[in-house]
UniProtKB/Swiss-Prot annotation:
The keyword rRNA-binding appears for this protein: no
Stored Gene3D superfamilies: 2.40.50.100
InterPro entries attached to this UniProt entry: Ribosomal_bL27, Ribosomal_bL27_CS
UniProt entry keywords in alphabetical sequence: Ribonucleoprotein, Ribosomal protein
Protein name: Large ribosomal subunit protein bL27
Gene designation per UniProt: rpmA
GO biological process: translation
Source organism (scientific name): Tropheryma whipplei (strain TW08/27) (Whipple's bacillus)
Length: 82
């Protein structure tokens, strides 16, 4: 492979699309079952009561109620109070 750049070439010019991660429903908000609460990579937030974790670590509500953020030991957890 050439170690010098050819005429009019560049090593830059690539960027990935934003993945729209983050908290989608905040503490105190009323949600229905199936609503996405947090989109994340890895488990920054862990599922609490009435919350499950999807294959891509997304947290979603399993029941209708009010969102609550808290701690479960040292872990940050998201729960839904019915």
């Amino acid at each position: 492979m050439a170690h010098k750049k050819g005429a009019s070439s560049s090593r830059n010019g690539r960027d990935s699309n934003a993945k729209r991660l983050g908290v989608k429903r905040f503490a105190g908000q009323v949600v229905s079952a199936g609503e996405i609460l947090v989109r994340q990579r890895g488990t920054r937030f862990h599922p609490g009561t009435n919350v499950r974790r999807g294959d891509d670590d997304t947290l979603f509500a399993c029941a209708s109620g009010r969102v609550r953020f808290g701690r479960s030991g040292k872990r940050r957890a998201v729960s839904v109070d019915t």
